[in-house]
Amino acid sequence: MGEHVRDEDLLEKVTNLAKRRGFFFPSAEIYGGFRSAYDYGPLGVNVLRNVKNAWWRSMVQMRVDVVGLDAAILGPPAIWAASGHLETFTDPLVDCRKCKERWREDKIDGVCPNCGSSEFTEARAFNLMFKTQAGPVEGEGATAYLRPETAQGMFTNFANVLATTRRKPPFGIAQVGKSFRNEITPQNSIFRTREFEQMEMEYFVPPAEADTWYRYWIETRHRWYLELGIAPEKLRLHEHAAADLSHYSRGTTDIEFDFPWGFDELEGIANRGDYDLTQHANASGVRLEYFDQANNERYVPYVIEPAAGATRAMMAFLLAAYEEDVVEGETRSVLRLHPRLAPYQVAVLPLSKKPDLEGLSREVLGLLQPHVMCDFDLTQSIGRRYRRQDEIGTPLCVTIDFDSLEDRAVTVRDRDTTAQTRVAIDELVATVLARLV
């Protein structure tokens, strides 16, 4: 491994890399862009899908006490009135009296980021929900909202899931999907945007067990980021003071990542108590509770909620993985992404475009594709192709050379060490899978 170079412009380097290599682009760029909106390119869509798949594997696939849900994005006002969003889902908005720009008051430290003025209007509550009309007839009866979080669909489906899965507390409902918040000051690339993807789980527990499960999920979710390659010193836990808690929370702890602008929220774990189920039960008239046959009693479960942003997590993984190494006197950019997150796990690289070599290379590609995501690259020198794969985070490169035609073996190159190993084609799939764990 080469000598590590100190990096002081990490955010700019990663966002430039993201655009140049096809991780994400400003949306509607040919029309001048659309603030706070991004389109995920060929590499980014793979990474984002891998982040969501890794979360789903950890939270649903590897457990028997959590099931999945995909609830509607559009919802009627009744849901958001009951949840408290119509009244309390706000940020403090101020206008700069000098340049007229609008800002979120608690994020600017009394100084306008645009012009430096310290003169602002009085703060006023700005609701972050997107309001729209459903159907062809305008009026209050047609009002709908884009969901600002995925959580409420899991609460309103509590009784449905309880009845159809025969689960009993403690159990969870998990969901991955788009949410929308009309942020006053979207910023820092894909970190804070108005359209984003969430990965949330509502874990329903007996009230007496809530604190135990709250601590359990803090530890479990913190460990997930470590297992996927984020260094311990890049993460910290921030427990909210009582005065800072959301209206529904009995306790909240954020997992924070050391972003280039400082530590900021990556995921929040909250003890929501029985607030949500009680609110929706009162508003709808439907009992949202569990009957404990063993003790012959009904109770409203408490809810422990680990809530993560998929797009925000993707950005943290990219920032944590980016390095510049000096290898053999040359500087290379490399994304040391965990193999489960990399856009491609393997790149198949024929040494030449000659038909017999390309034919064998496509045979090798066909062996690998059922097992891992593969790139196939014929262009430029092999050294440049290695550097390209390093820069996009591909853990392994498989090179097919002219000796391969004779000995039915290929060269497997490691992204992180640049070490190369000769492997028989018959053993390639097993070797690759073993190295990608």
Spans of features found by a protein language model:
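NTP/phosphate- and nucleic-acid-binding module
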Residues: 1-437
